[in-house]
Amino acid sequence: MTEEATTHRRRFLGRMFGAAAAAGLSMAGTATRAAAQDAGADDWIKEVKGTHKCLFDFPTHNNGMPLLHIFNFLNTYTTAYKTAAGQAGAVGTLYSAGQKSSIPLGFNDAIWTKYEIGAYLGLKDAAGKPYTRNVFNSPTPNDLHLLLGALNSPNIPALSGVMPAMAIPSLQKMGTKFILCNNALGLWCLELEARGKGKAADIDKELRANLLPGVTIVPAMVIAIEKAQEAGIRYNRQ
């Protein structure tokens, strides 16, 4: 491909993504944008406590492996480094779109049931049925096969106890802040509309009303990652 052709392709993709992002942003509504501005787009950074802080960047869910890595980070500081409570903090990023994305992790069981998120992500319970609940919000020892599947590993019963420990609420209590990309949310709503799940604007409104507690929507993940580094939060790509 010539340099001229490459440049043309980049411009085309840029315009296409820009149009999609703009459409997604428009669905947020004036009230939502105003509320976000009043609250401060970067106020979430203040919720990341401690002297040891790291952002875990995971656009894909990878069967929950990024959550395990966050747990490992926080737990190791406590157990091996004897760090006092509140001295280690983490950030988890929920964004992207498509059937491997991490963005569905930010929503409650009602959304997972209505939009058949388990089937959408290709995640099945121990009985082989698609999950109808957000398994990453309330995992049990019986969900260990998800992690082991990501590792292509046979069953290791001794690891089953880690599943409840890496639940989103558990990680939040340990010092993790989860953020969700507004631009990616708009794109995902358009995707769900294309899949016949309803009108994108209606989907957007419902998703925002069913966020997990403590999850904050940020204007753009690419900016949030930059802002985190400016604030001294380390970066870990998953």
Report each predicted region and the residues it spans.
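N-terminal secretory signal peptides and thylakoid transit peptides that target proteins
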Residues: 1-20
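Loop/turn elements at helix/coil->beta-strand transitions in domains of secreted/extracellular proteins
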Residues: 51-52, 86-90, 173-177, 231-233
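Solvent-exposed loop/turn segments at secondary-structure junctions
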Residues: 61-63, 96-101, 178, 183-188, ...
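Histidine-anchored nucleotide/phosphate-binding helix
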Residues: 64-83
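Glycine-rich, aromatic-bearing surface loops/beta-hairpins
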Residues: 180, 192-238
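A glycine-rich helix N-cap at a beta->alpha junction
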Residues: 110-149
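C-terminal segment of N-terminal export signals and the immediately downstream linker at the start
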Residues: 5, 27-52
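Acidic helix-start/capping segments at beta-turn-to-alpha-helix junctions
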Residues: 83-107
